[in-house]
């Protein structure tokens, strides 16, 4: 959430920066609410001062033996007006809060201005795509004989769900374990096991609610506990749970940075993706991801962003997968991000790079919603900065391994770093 003081003091600049990411801020609604807030606040303060002064007259009149009935009636009337003003002021503040909850983050000055992914800027490419001397298959055709079962997934749950069996299920698990071990043992993250179901407050804190409720899977408790109708949701990413660990907390300065990671399933309705990537595992309602979260001092968050990109790259390099790093433009960034890098892996069957990780600095945008703070050198509470990124999306990494490591006979070479997790297997094939 944006700082309302920044809107009050620098409205034109904020509106222009929001416009650069394709967001039209409702200036008229904001100004109308602000003008009413100022009017009501001034009137309320005047009423409070008048009531205090009038209340003092009661004591003076009583000491003189005078009748105080009229003064007490006036105080009561002022009290009623004051209550009415305070209630209206609270309602205005709530309306301003709702308005701000729908406003995205301001892009950092280093983010290129653009409208769509076509305006993103390639930063670097790493690795050379392999030249094949046979007809390349996509991951669906490679994976089906190896235990990738889309038909049973659809029978169990519907479209965009997958069942895995045997060695391909083991390879999927090996990828997740390798990613977790890399992030914890080499990059200093603390592994967490988190709930897969969260309340609405958690999703508001990280920015999924209220704007993106259609992208979520809602859940409800059964039995007597379900009678409260409290809203619960399946997590779209463990960014939600990991970042919310500091909600309503003031953390010690010497505990920063806080570096957390988790391997969880992620659940997304893909409401805006009808008809896109309907074949295979690229866009699923349920997929696994190893998430990285850093919670940092504001002065260090952009160093942390570059560091986290490197942590995600390390996994791709260890697996021997060609990829590129892309700096997203203002119009292609996620709602809460001030700056985002995407890592895109090479998929031979599509003859293109596809996103496999997104790493973002949200600055204080989430922390303001979460009231996540630290005590600075002067002992004063100050908002933290939060960052998140995939380290990596497990299903898409499996897709990349299948396609890049495929052999002419339909088998797949297991990346060397995964072989200890695969019982020493060097190849998986249908014959196994």
From Swiss-Prot:
InterPro entries xrefs: aa-tRNA-synt_IIb, aa-tRNA-synth_II, aa-tRNA-synth_II/BPL/LPL, Ser-tRNA-ligase_type_1, Ser-tRNA-synth_1_N, SerRS_1_N_sf, SerRS_core, tRNA-bd_arm
GO molecular function: ATP binding; serine-tRNA ligase activity
EC number, UniProt record: 6.1.1.11
Binding site for L-serine: 237-239, 291, 390
Record pathway: Aminoacyl-tRNA biosynthesis; selenocysteinyl-tRNA(Sec) biosynthesis; L-seryl-tRNA(Sec) from L-serine and tRNA(Sec): step 1/1
Pfam families the UniProt entry points to: Seryl_tRNA_N, tRNA-synt_2b
Keywords, alphabetical: Aminoacyl-tRNA synthetase, ATP-binding, Cytoplasm, Ligase, Nucleotide-binding, Protein biosynthesis
Positions of disulphide bridges: none
GO cellular component, one term: cytoplasm
SUPFAM superfamilies: Class II aaRS and biotin synthetases, tRNA-binding arm
Subcellular location: Cytoplasm
GO annotation, biological process: selenocysteine biosynthetic process; seryl-tRNA aminoacylation
Superkingdom of origin organism: Bacteria
Record's catalysed reaction(s): tRNA(Ser) + L-serine + ATP = L-seryl-tRNA(Ser) + AMP + diphosphate + H(+); tRNA(Sec) + L-serine + ATP = L-seryl-tRNA(Sec) + AMP + diphosphate + H(+)
Binding of ATP, residues: 268-270, 355-358
Function (record text): Catalyzes the attachment of serine to tRNA(Ser). Is also able to aminoacylate tRNA(Sec) with serine, to form the misacylated tRNA L-seryl-tRNA(Sec), which will be further converted into selenocysteinyl-tRNA(Sec).
Family: Belongs to the class-II aminoacyl-tRNA synthetase family. Type-1 seryl-tRNA synthetase subfamily.
Assembly behavior: Homodimer. The tRNA molecule binds across the dimer.
Entry domain remark: Consists of two distinct domains, a catalytic core and a N-terminal extension that is involved in tRNA binding.
Protein known as: Serine--tRNA ligase
